[in-house]
């Protein structure tokens, strides 16, 4: 998805309202991807509320309900929760924690290197490669970024160099600044 994928507001190409059958399919996909979301899904996406897909540049689609940006994906890829949603429902993703030193890099969009996950202050929890995770930071209450495991937690510990987690969406990026879409 590359850096700065949500930089310009005018990159929204169109917005479509989804049919009930499509919404059902999306909800099933979300339940499959994020089993922990089940008790909250009807709260996040109430049955009566229209669900829209906002299409952006680079084939990015953002799922919105009542203007709230909930999930996004690229092409037919997996859905990722937005940080705003994650801050309300922090337990829908497994967590990984970086040390204090990694914070400024994560917030500038950098990928997370293995040493930032294995040093004192970091907490590395078991997770397989390709798992979507919430990146927490030492001393911070809320997730800083949504990432994807590029290596398993076990390999991150063993190898301890290179990119451990790809940074997909971080605080203060363009998607964060979109806030809502009416």
UniProtKB/Swiss-Prot annotation:
The modification Phosphoserine is found at residue 119. It is found in: Cytoplasm. The modification Phosphothreonine is found at residue 82. SMART domains: PUA (SM00359). Keywords: Cell cycle, Cytoplasm, DNA damage, Growth regulation, Phosphoprotein, Transcription, Transcription regulation, Tumor suppressor. Residues 93-172 form the PUA domain. One of its GO terms (cellular component) is cytoplasm. The keyword Transcription applies. GO terms for molecular function: ribosomal small subunit binding; RNA cap binding; translation factor activity, non-nucleic acid binding; translation initiation factor activity. GO terms for biological process: DNA damage response; formation of translation preinitiation complex; IRES-dependent viral translational initiation; ribosome disassembly; translation reinitiation. CDD domains: MCT1_N (cd11609), PUA_MCTS-1-like (cd21155). Phosphorylation is critical for stabilization and promotion of cell proliferation. It comes from the Eukaryota. Interacts (via PUA domain) with DENR; the complex regulates translation reinitiation. The PUA RNA-binding domain is critical for cap binding, but not sufficient for translation enhancer function. MCT1 N-terminal region is required to enhance translation possibly through interaction with other proteins. Translation regulator forming a complex with DENR to promote translation reinitiation. Translation reinitiation is the process where the small ribosomal subunit remains attached to the mRNA following termination of translation of a regulatory upstream ORF (uORF), and resume scanning on the same mRNA molecule to initiate translation of a downstream ORF, usually the main ORF (mORF). The MCTS1/DENR complex is pivotal to two linked mechanisms essential for translation reinitiation. Belongs to the MCTS1 family. This is Malignant T-cell-amplified sequence 1.
């Amino acid at each position: 998805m590359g850096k700065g994928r949500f930089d310009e507001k005018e990159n929204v190409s169109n917005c479509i309202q989804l049919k009930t059958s499509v919404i059902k399919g999306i909800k099933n996909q979300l339940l499959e991807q994020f089993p922990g979301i089940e008790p909250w899904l009807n709260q996040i996406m109430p049955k009566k509320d229209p669900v829209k897909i906002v299409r952006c540049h680079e084939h990015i689609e953002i799922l919105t309900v009542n203007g709230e940006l909930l999930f996004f994906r690229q092409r037919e890829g997996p859905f990722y929760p937005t940080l705003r949603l994650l801050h309300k429902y922090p337990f829908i993703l497994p967590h990984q924690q970086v040390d204090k030193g990694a914070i400024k890099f994560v917030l500038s969009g950098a990928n997370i290197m293995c040493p930032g996950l294995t040093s004192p202050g970091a907490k590395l929890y078991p997770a397989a490669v390709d798992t979507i995770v919430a990146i927490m930071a030492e001393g911070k209450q809320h997730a800083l970024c949504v990432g994807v495991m590029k290596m398993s937690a076990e390999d991150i510990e063993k190898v301890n160099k290179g990119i451990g987690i790809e940074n997909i969406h971080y605080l203060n990026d363009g998607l964060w600044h979109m806030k809502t879409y009416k």
